[in-house]
Amino acid sequence: MKFRSLVKATSQALTNLGYTPLFPNLDYSGENKDVALTIKEKNKLAWDHYKAVEEADAVYFILPQGYMGTSCKIELGYALALKKPIYYSEPTKDIGLDGYPKKFISLDNLIEFNDEFSRK
């Protein structure tokens, strides 16, 4: 997974705000890169992410410098098919992708999720 350390930090920040982030396989490797060595392994990791999309109330895409890789694009399509609310950390600068999020919520301003979801 690219940007693993950033995803871990974001997961912790969301937890601190009272959310339950579903970021599968964060501890699969300490490396910030794709570490699957076989197609079978890659498929297993991908399906773990699709299951998290199914279970999520909303899907937040962490997009450093607007980068969205192939796996994220597939997850985006799946989330859209499931009619999940979509959020991006920043625009991708691709109008084909930037029309989908309900809102852009920067990594520095995750508290904005409290405005999106009623906190009782």
Where are these regions (language model features)?
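Conserved catalytic or regulatory cores that recognize and/or transform ribose-phosphate-containing ligands
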Residues: M1-K120
